[in-house]
Amino acid sequence: MRIKIDKNSDALYFRLDESRIVESEEIRPGVILDYDKDNRVIGVEFLGISQRATKEELSSLQFQTA
């Protein structure tokens, strides 16, 4: 898994798997899911991230495991 913040595009991208992306779908404005050949979600992109989170929130992402 990897996370990328692109300041130029104002986007945050979670990549869950390195499989080839075969389809993308905007499920709501500014939220795009990427799918592999088996229709599994392998990536999630948030556009306009500066409107969704503060710089402080983006600089210290926190993870929880269950």
Describe every region a protein language model picked out.
Residues 1-66:
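Small, basic N-terminal interaction modules of short regulatory proteins
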